[in-house]
């Protein structure tokens, strides 16, 4: 008898019922959040549920078709092939067991079962963005290459008062927030549904200013869907100069945690640093509404200036560790696939055949050997 089931997002009630059996859960694991990333064609959400009696491990991910990619077509693989990835945010497998030998054994059994499932399903690769607050990277390692990516920062919301909240800030942040409170700025907690255009304008403008990777350019429909699918679990905080929005942030939440999810600002107001007041107001709101932690995330690359900016909101707390996990289920086929790509790129991108700068130019058919290998003659 099978000890696992696989659910799609259409089984949202059952999906979320399994999450409710966990002591620790987060909005990034919810069926509603995963529905944001489904495209109806090449990408669908799945929840892998592994059960041993009352013991449980759940693992939500995106099942993504690779059969339509030029290099895969050129290789002539039969049937449907896929890879899996956790979406933007944090994820990985989580269990209802407390830390200890019993949970470690359950993860080992889960890993073996999940590996067999992936190979049978023709899943080429797996990419995991582990959850810094849960720390599940240390549990799920069998067959996986796990690497530290960066530190992330969180604000402790259990301190009891606004003055205690501010006491944990760096001296520069304290001064700026005090000045901003007496400046002509106000903070508004708005309904995202009513502010799609305003948020999008500042968000995309900020990405352009930062010359951000294409990965972060979520379409406007994604923002609209966020307002609908996550209703009741999404807040929009805006820093206002009169009726003009000068900084804005989407905060996602599911008790006990909040996440600083997407943000934007008007570069003309950067000298005022209104984002500091925005983050402080969101933290104060979270504290007043019974949340325990406000996760700010990390920098763009390592412990850069953005990381330092966030760290000054939590100077008395140790940063968290953010890990990535990578696995190739069919190594020989993977190497053959990427050999059919125009690989004039470098770096550690995984899986390589999805690199956004990859031309994906297939090798001409006359360069393909009788066994599907690339001929370099």
Give the residues covered by each predicted segment.
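A conserved beta-strand-loop-helix scaffold within acyl/acetyltransferase catalytic domains
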Residues: 2-74, 131-271
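Aromatic side chains
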Residues: 18, 28, 33, 88-90, ...
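Active-site/acyl-donor-binding loops of N-acyltransferases
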Residues: 63-67, 133, 141-163, 289-377
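Acyl-donor binding region in acyl/amide transferases
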Residues: 69-145, 255-318
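A broadly tuned preference for mixed-charge, low-complexity surface segments
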Residues: 60-62, 99-111, 116, 175-186, ...
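Solvent-exposed, well-ordered amphipathic alpha-helical segments
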Residues: 1-6, 10-14, 49-54, 97, ...
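Tryptophan-centered motif/residue detector
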Residues: 15, 43-45, 285, 313, ...
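Low-complexity, flexible helical/coil segments
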Residues: 39-43, 87, 93-103, 161-165, ...
